[in-house]
């Protein structure tokens, strides 16, 4: 599925590689920015979408963070630009489902994706989990 089918791709003039930079770019708090974290679970990759201000307890998942090279290989996107729409299993923090809109990676350092978290679940693109 194309990113445009899930939300609005916002082109930026300056690169955004961190939650803080993304929040500044759209003029919102860091709590409105989400990050997509890719983990390696014994050679199988998964992605977790969570609020930019939250940390993912990778050890409790029995996984490890994917290396930048693994992220690119597994998703086709660089670290910092990974969107929430992927060809690997995606899990979204259920606390995000109450948000009208959030902003996440848009596929590169010069774009963000504005989307409704609930749409990912309704379209079968992500499974809600308690993180």
Where are these regions (language model features)?
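Extended, low-hydrophobicity, polar/charged segments
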Residues: 1-131
């Amino acid at each position: 599925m194309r990113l445009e089918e899930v939300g609005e791709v916002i082109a930026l003039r300056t690169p955004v590689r961190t939650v803080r930079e993304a929040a500044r770019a759209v003029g919102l708090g860091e709590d409105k920015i989400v990050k997509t974290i890719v983990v390696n679970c014994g050679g199988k990759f998964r992605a977790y979408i969570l609020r930019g201000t939250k940390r993912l307890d990778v050890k409790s998942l029995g996984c490890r963070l994917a290396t930048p090279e693994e992220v690119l290989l597994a998703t086709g996107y660089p670290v910092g630009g990974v969107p929430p729409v992927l060809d690997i299993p995606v899990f979204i923090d259920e606390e995000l489902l109450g948000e009208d809109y959030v902003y996440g990676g848009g596929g590169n350092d010069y774009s963000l994706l504005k989307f409704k978290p609930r749409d990912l679940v309704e379209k079968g693109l992500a499974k809600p989990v308690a993180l």
